[in-house]
């Protein structure tokens, strides 16, 4: 048994003893995805965290994801293996700035992407993910003004899909916003038989070049069900691990080399083991914030 096998065995034993569930986002390292009980997108992970009977949730993702699990499951122990695993886009929306913008607009409906902090969710009316953003926007009365926080690209996509005019917060995902049309066009020249599949956090001019726009779970389902054998994947590179496992024989190409989320890659097997041992770093949310943030999440999950 080599060191990695010993580490996995130790994680499995600690998971059993702690009555824990390990949740992983698609953008995690391959070896972390492989030891998880569930791998999914933000919406799937939120639903799993809310429904689990496990006593401990080890969240292999970034801080806002673990925070969301703590909001939905306040009596569970939620641990994030590395506290440095933050989300730059979530940090682009600060609660005081949001309050000021709400006052400026005069009672807008605030739709916050789950890629936000708990206090921003608490100031919001409803949350959304990339998988359900269109459904969320369509659920809002057409006579209400909508402020979309924080991803300008996802908001622009939702506006185009629904025909609604949204006030967009000027945030973005560094990985997706760095994908440019020339990257897609170059990849198409190199792989002319490949379909282009991109995430709605990409720029509008990149989305215009895509054959399919979908959330991470939607991307996985699309490539699995497609009769095509080659795909250019416009999202963080970690997703290609699950695609490769589910679709042996199909080929996946990244349009540029910079499609890596450094925060997601901070989580390692050693840190997962240590988190299970110590039940730290634990993620908690003050009750007065948790209660209000929960309302926004529950409105989303009810759709």
Swiss-Prot record:
Role this protein plays: Catalyzes the condensation of iminoaspartate with dihydroxyacetone phosphate to form quinolinate.
Q: What class of enzyme is it?
A: transferase
Q: Which UniProt keywords apply?
A: 4Fe-4S, Cytoplasm, Iron, Iron-sulfur, Metal-binding, Pyridine nucleotide biosynthesis, Transferase
| Residue sites binding iminosuccinate per the record | 25, 42, 113-115, 130, 199-201, 216
Quick check: keyword Oxidoreductase in the entry? no
**What is the scientific name of the source organism?**
Desulforudis audaxviator (strain MP104C)
Name the Gene Ontology biological process terms.
'de novo' NAD biosynthetic process from L-aspartate
Q: Which InterPro entries match?
A: NadA, NadA_sf, Quinolinate_synth_type2
This protein's cofactor list reads: [4Fe-4S] cluster
Q: What is its EC number?
A: 2.5.1.72
- Name of the protein: Quinolinate synthase
């Amino acid at each position: 048994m080599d060191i990695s096998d010993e580490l996995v065995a130790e994680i499995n034993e600690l998971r059993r003893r702690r009555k824990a569930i390990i949740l992983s986002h698609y953008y995690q390292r391959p070896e972390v995805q492989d030891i998880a009980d569930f791998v999914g997108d933000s919406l799937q992970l939120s639903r799993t965290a809310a429904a689990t009977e496990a006593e401990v949730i080890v969240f292999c993702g970034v801080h806002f994801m673990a925070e969301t699990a703590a909001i939905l499951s306040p009596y569970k122990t939620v641990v994030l293996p590395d506290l440095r695993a933050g989300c730059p886009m979530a940090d682009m929306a600060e609660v005081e700035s949001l309050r000021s913008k709400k006052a400026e607009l005069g009672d807008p409906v605030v739709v916050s992407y789950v890629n936000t902090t708990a206090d921003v969710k608490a100031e919001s009316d409803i949350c959304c993910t990339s998988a359900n953003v269109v459904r969320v926007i369509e659920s809002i009365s057409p006579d209400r003004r909508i402020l979309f926080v924080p991803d300008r690209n996802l908001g622009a996509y939702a506006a185009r899909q629904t025909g609604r005019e949204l006030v967009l917060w000027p945030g973005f995902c560094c990985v997706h916003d760095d994908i440019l049309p020339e990257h897609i066009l170059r990849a198409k020249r190199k792989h002319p038989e490949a379909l282009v599949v991109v995430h709605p956090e990409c720029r509008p001019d990149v989305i215009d070049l895509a054959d399919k726009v979908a959330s991470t779970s939607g991307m996985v389902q699309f490539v699995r069900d497609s009769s095509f054998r080659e795909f250019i994947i416009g999202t963080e590179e970690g997703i290609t691990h699950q695609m490769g496992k589910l679709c042996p024989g199909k080929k996946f190409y990244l349009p540029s080399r910079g499609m890596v989320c450094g925060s997601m890659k901070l989580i390692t097997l050693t840190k997962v083991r240590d988190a299970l041992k110590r039940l730290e770093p634990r993620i908690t949310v003050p009750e007065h914030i948790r209660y209000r943030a929960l309302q926004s999440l529950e409105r989303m999950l009810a759709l």
